Amino acid sequence: MRILIDIGHPAHVHLFKNFAKIMMGKGHQVLFTCREKEFEIELLKANGFTYQSFGKKYKSIIGKILGLLKFDYMEWKACRKFKPDILLSHGSMYAAHAAWLVRKPHIAFDDTYNMEQIHLYEPFTPVLLTGDYEHPRVSKKEIRYAGYHELSYLHPNYYTPNKDILKDLGVTPDEKYVLVRFIALNATHDIGNKGIPTKQKIEAVKALTKYAKVFISSEGVLPQELEQYRLKTRPEQLIDVMAFASLVWGESITIPAEAAVLGVPAMNNNNMKSYYLIDEQDNYGLCYCYKSNEDDLNKALQKCIELLKRDKQDLSAEWKAKRDKLLNDHIDVTAFLVWFVENYPGSKQIMTDNPDYQYRFK
């Protein structure tokens, strides 16, 4: 089988990497395509994947419209050359359109439920895989599975934190540190979302340094006052940094979701509603969701300080128990995807007739 996987965000590399390695180990051929947003290329190289880059993403609205035409054409050309049997993506309109043009199936994951994107790819996509938590039904083509995207790469079947990262960070096992994540807010679903004001970012980081070391991962330029806290590890080490943190806080949605699945207390300030983060908050108590207004920023900061004042081992043990419950309730997403793709389209019918079939993949 020849499989083309289109990547639109660094987290999508993680989403598909274990699936790709398993499929390649079975003799299937896999090609990744991508646009360059942040550090997708570094992650693809670190995993040894064959990939084709279509260049930089566009930031302006007009640029995004032009990019749709350009990247559609480049995806179609990649398909014509690679000749995939099936295409996979996280809601990629480019993969969907190219798949339709070459008359091959496109399987899409989705966990953001941005209708402006869904309208562009759903008509050309025969199946959408979405989590079984509460979220808007975006299509009659949905198949819901018991999991989150983050479980495809942070499930204990695939990931064990590397303690060597502590040496790279210059911290001891007993020392508290906070991972802070700031994002560029350039995606289509970020339009109108201004994020955390610079002044509040500086004030919050300064406040956190009174209780723990602070490391900042940022998509863009940091204020001069915060540059000293910039994380200097390699992109592929970010998850290890997160795994040993006492707390994760920031504007990003993906990073707090990863922290929650790892059993690390996570704080999110973002005006975009994240259904899976809300599920992890309401049903497991693993994270805290706030908006970016000043009142919510103060609430988030106070919650951060409250948690950082607690004993490190006690806090870690409490979050581990919460994580264990989450893992017990969900499937091995990668194992499920391997089965689903290898047996498609029969797997689609099986899941339609008997959704509980997925619990074989634990």
Protein language model annotation of sequence segments:
Residues 129-195:
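A nucleotide-sugar donor-handling region in carbohydrate enzymes
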